[in-house]
Amino acid sequence: MFFLKKQEKIQVLVFFVGLSFFSPVAFSADFDNEFEEKPWKEIEVQLPPFPERENLIPFEVGSVTDKQFFIDGDSLSVGSDEVIRYTMVVIGSGGAQNISFEGMRCTTGERRSYAFGRSDKTWSRVRNGQWGKIRGGSNQGHVNLFSDYFCNVGERAILSPEDARRALRYGRSATFR
């Protein structure tokens, strides 16, 4: 650069300074900031109508229980927050029913309850309901919903209520034919 005139030196300097703004390092910093994952935010949840017997879809939990497990097909939804929401009905051998409106996050393996059904066919909202990990034991119905119907690892996620109903009625593998 020592053989260039002063004005040419300034032009070359400006060129290289300008070029540095487009360097991979400068670009990658902006790129990372633009595409940072935003923190997950749950959408506002509306309670569904109380389940009707004709809308209940049975699902298998295994031979270790004498309870019957159902999902209300009309309550199924998949939110923009990627939560599958549903009403679960569990009927014990003596006929007692437990009804709950719940959500499941396939990406984190968590679930939460939003409300429980009362005998007068109304909902009782859960106060301070928190997301918790899906584990076996007394929650076997949730484990089966997660692994066998809604969130099977390695397969496409349930994207719509129709996908979820099809998985419950015909098995997980029938969902994506």
Name the predicted role of every residue range:
Residues 15-16, 26-27:
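Cleavable N-terminal signal peptides
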Residues 2-13:
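Bacterial N-terminal signal peptides that target proteins for export
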Residues 27-177:
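N-terminal secretory-pathway/extracellular module detecting exported/lumenal segments
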